[in-house]
Amino acid sequence: DAGIYLTASGEEIKKFNARDGLAMSRLNKNGLRVAILSHSKNIDIIRKRADMLGLETWYAGQEKKSLILARWAQEYGIPPESMLYLGDDLNDLDAFRYVGVGVCPADADPLIKKHAALILESKGGEACFRELADRAFRDLLLFEP
């Protein structure tokens, strides 16, 4: 939902969608490399979410997203044109230009929508990853290893 929640003491809290999490976890267990790539400054929250979902591949920081994707492409032997990226804002544009398929939620920035191969019906934070998984990888979601 693009929201950043802060407590009175200044602690950052993030909301994650449980349906997105189930889809990420299942796809990852079934052989698709699912990763989290965030410009969040709160590395601990992203690490904790990745751990909860069993995801080994994640990044939180300010480096250009395309550079992180290039690193992962080399590390895992994945051609960039075989990568799919889900993003919603201007800081995702370089990633959209790097990967083969860019996907965005319904409420993405207009420039991101212009570069997207697919615009989902769901808004960010409202199970848009799950929508993507249901559309593209339904059989893998149903299989529980």
Predicted features and spans:
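Active-site neighborhood of HAD-like aspartate-dependent phosphohydrolases
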Residues: 1-33
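Short, basic/glycine-rich phosphate-binding loops at helix/coil junctions
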Residues: 2-7, 46-53
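Cytosolic catalytic headpiece of P-type ATPases
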Residues: 4, 42, 127-128
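Mg2+-dependent phosphoryl-transfer enzymes with acidic/Ser/Thr/Gly-rich catalytic loops
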Residues: 10, 17, 52, 57, ...
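Substrate-recognition element of Asp-dependent hydrolases with the DxDx(T/V) motif
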Residues: 24-48, 96
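Short secondary-structure boundary segments
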Residues: 39-40, 62, 106-109
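Feature captures the catalytic cores and cofactor-binding loops of soluble hydro-lyases/lyases
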Residues: 44, 62-66
